[in-house]
Amino acid sequence: MKEDNCLHAALICLGMLYYSHAITTEKLNHVRPSLHGHHEKGKEGQVLHRSKRGWVWNQFFVIEEYTGPDPVLVGRLHSDIDSGDGNIKYILSGEGAGIIFVIDDKSGNIHATKTLDREERAQYTLTAQAVDRNTNRPLEPPSEFIVKVQDINDNPPEFLHENYHANVPERSNVGTSVIQVTASDADDPTYGNSAKLVYSILEGQPYFSVEAQTGIIRTALPNMDREAKEEYHVVIQAKDMGGHMGGLSGTTKVTITLTDVNDNPPKFPQSVYQMSVSEAAVPGEEVGRVKAKDPDIGENGLVAYSIIDGDGMDMFEITTDYETQEGVVKLKKVLDFETKKSYSLKVEAANVHIDPKFISNGPFKDTVTVKITVEDADEPPVFLKPSYIFEVQENAASGTVVGKVHAKDPDAANSAIRYSIDRHTDLERYFTINADDGNIKTIKALDREEIAWHNISVFAVEVHKQHQEAKVPVAIKVVDVNDNAPKFAAAYEAFVCENARSNQQFITISADDKDDSANGPRFIFSLPPEIIHNPNFSLRDNRDNTASVLVRREGFSRQKQDLYLLPIVISDGGLPPMSSTNTLTIRVCGCDSNGSLLSCNAEAYILNAGLSTGALIAILACIVILLVIVVLFVTLKRQKKEPLIVFEEEDVRENIITYDDEGGGEEDTEAFDIATLQNPDGINGFIPRKDIKPEYQYMPRPGLRPAPNSVDVDDFINTRIQEADNDPTAPPYDSIQIYGYEGRGSVAGSLSSLESATTDSDLDYDYLQNWGPRFKKLADLYGSKDTFDDDS
C-alpha cells in the first residue's frame, strides 16, 4: 500500500513537470527559417541574393504514459512565409501521422492523440511540408523530424528466472561465491535512474549475503554443516531508482543446497559383535554382518572393512557390501568344533576417500571386536583319502581282493561305519564290498580288452544315522596279461604274376594284438616248421613288426594252379609269448612286363570282396528268379487287362441319337465304347487317329526274352509300358478326341427329362427300360410322356 501511494505521488509530480515542459516545448519547438543564397542578376550587372526559405528542425519530445483528458501538445510547425492569413497549409506524414500524431493545418500545432509507451517504441520519424492552401503547391521542401518518447519509471525490475537453484560445499569459508542473480529493467537506462538497480537480501540472513551492484550471493557464516541443515531458501530483491524511495522492485527465490564433504569419520554403534557358525558350514558361507555409520553421503560415506587382528584371521575373511555399506564376515576354511570352538576378530572400518582439507578431523576409521562361536554339527563320515586307485589282473579268480577303503566318524560319538557300492557305477556287478571293513573284491573275471578301467563309487554311512553318508570315487585298473595271440592286421589277399621273378617281393604284412603294448610287439613272423622250405614262397621278418612275402621260384601258371594258401606263424613279445597261425591267400594272375595285372581269376575278385563262389552263385540265382517273377507278373497283368472292346450282352453298339448337325463324319457318329473309360490304362497322352496313318509301322511285339545280367528291372518295365502305350495296332483303333470338347458349349442345349418328354417325336424310347441298370438314367431321361406324368 505504501508503494502504491508513493507511485501515485510520483505520477502527480511527473504530470506537473510535463505541463511545464509542454509550454516550454511550444516556445522552443518552432520552425525557424534558414536563408540559403541564390544568385540572380539585377540592374547594372549587380548580383543580387534572393532568399530561399528552408526548414531547420529541433527534436520534439513527448512524455510516455500520459493519461490526461486532452491530447498532448508535441510541438508547433511554423514558416516565416506564413503571414497568418490562412493561405499556408501544413501537412504531416510519416510514422503514426494521422493516427497517433495530428497537425492543425493552419497553426501547425502537433498533438499526440494516444498514450505512448517508450518500451514499445522510443521514437517516431515524421515529415513536415508547407503548401499553398488553394493550389496545394509546395511552398517549402519537405523535411523530416523526430519525436522522441520521454521515459518515466513505469517498469519494475524483472529477474531472468523466477527460481534459482545453487550448490555450495558445506564448511565453505565466508565470502564463498554461491550464484549470481540478474534482473533487468525495461525503462530507459540513459535517462534518469529508472533502470539503475540495487540488489538486497530479504530472506536467508545471516547465512548468506548479496552484493548490491552485481547480485552475487556469497556465504556469510563459516562451517555450515550439511548434516545439521542441508537446504536454505533465500529471497533476493532488485530495486530501481538506485534503491531510493519511490523505486519499483522485483524479487526472486534462490534455493541453496549444501553439498557433502568428507568431514565425518565412520563409527561403529557398538564395541563388540557376537556371531555363531556351524562347523558344517562350507567356505564362502556368510557368518554375519557389521556396519559402521557415516553421516556423509556418496563417495564421502563409502567405508571399506578389513580384519586387522585376531586368532581367526586365517579362518575368516570380510568383504564390503557397497550397496548396504556393511562388512560381510565369511568363512574362509572348514571349521572343526572338536579342534576349536570360538574365534575373535578385530575389524576396522575406514573411509575410502579422505579429503585432505579435513584430515585434522581424523582419523577417518574405527575398529570393533567380532567374537565367533563354532557350533557342533552331526557330520557325515570322512574317507581317509579323497579318492582311491587300485589294480587287479585280468582273468583273476572271483573273490580276488582289489583293495580297501576306510572312513571314520569325525564326531565324538565315533559311530560304526558301513560300506556299499553305488550300483549305478557298477551296472554289470563286477565288484562287491565288505560292508564292515571296506574290502573290495571281484565277482567275476575281468577282461582288460573289454574294459581297461572301472570307475565306481563307494558309500560310507553311519550305522545309527544312515542319513549321514559320504561318497568316494574308486578307480580300478585291470592289469593286462598276455591272453591274446597276434593276428593279421587286415584280411590280406595277395596276387602274384605268372611272370614273377625269383625272390621278388609281392606283399608286406603286419600284425595286431589286443593285449597291452607290453604283451604285444615286437612281433615275430615265421613259416610253420613243416613248410619252412616252401618251394613256392619265402617269408622275411623285417623286424619292425612287419614281414615281406617273396617268390621263391619262377614259372607260375594259372592253368596249373591259380590259388595258393600260405600259413604264417605270428608270435608276440609277452611272457609267456602267444602265437597264432594265419593263412595268406595268394592268387596267380596275368601281368604285363611292368608287373601290372591284366587278368586274374574272377573268384579272386570275389574273394577279395569277402564273397565265396557259392555265395556269388546264390546271389545271381536270386537276381534271376526275381527278374523272372517280375516279367511273369507284367505279362499276366497285360493278358488280364480288360479288353478295350467289350463284348457283353448288355453292350449296345448302335447310335442312340445321331449328332449330324455339324456335318460330322464317321468318327462323329460312331458310338463310344464305355469300356475305354473303364480301362484308364489304355489312355495316355498319345491317342491314335483313324484318319491319320502311322508314320512308321511297329514290328510285331517280341516275346519275352531272358534279361541280360546287368538288366535294370525298372527300365525293363517302363520300356514295356511305353511299347504298349504307343502301339497303334492295339485296340481301340478309334479316336476319342471329340470328347475333349466337353464343357465348351453346344447348340443342342442341355438334356432334361422335361424337355424330352414334351418333344414331338416319332421315336419310342421305351426299349431303354430293358437295357438294364446301366442305362437306367438314360431310360429316365427319354421315358414316355405318360410315364413322366405318372412319376410326377
From Swiss-Prot:
Residues 54-613 are extracellular. Gene3D superfamilies: Cadherins, TCF3-CBD (Catenin binding domain). It comes from the Eukaryota. Its main location: membrane. GO terms for molecular function: beta-catenin binding; cadherin binding; calcium ion binding; protein dimerization activity. The keyword Cell membrane applies. SMART domains: CA. Residues 1-22 form the signal peptide. GO terms for cellular component: adherens junction; catenin complex; cell-cell junction; plasma membrane. Residues 635-792 are cytoplasmic. GO terms for biological process: adherens junction organization; calcium-dependent cell-cell adhesion via plasma membrane cell adhesion molecules; cell migration; cell morphogenesis; cell-cell adhesion; cell-cell adhesion mediated by cadherin; cell-cell junction assembly; collagen fibril organization. It is a single-pass type I membrane protein. Residues 54-159, 160-268, 269-383, 384-486, 487-608 form the Cadherin domain. PROSITE patterns: CADHERIN_1, CADHERIN_2. It is found in: Cell membrane. The chain crosses the membrane at residues 614-634. InterPro entries: Cadherin, Cadherin-like_dom, Cadherin-like_sf, Cadherin_CS, Cadherin_Y-type_LIR, Catenin-bd_sf. Residues 23-53 form a propeptide. The keyword Glycoprotein applies. Three calcium ions are usually bound at the interface of each cadherin domain and rigidify the connections, imparting a strong curvature to the full-length ectodomain. PANTHER family: CADHERIN-11 (PTHR24027:SF85), CADHERIN-23 (PTHR24027). Cadherins are calcium-dependent cell adhesion proteins. They preferentially interact with themselves in a homophilic manner in connecting cells; cadherins may thus contribute to the sorting of heterogeneous cell types. Required for proper focal adhesion assembly. Involved in the regulation of cell migration. This is Cadherin-11. The gene is CDH11.
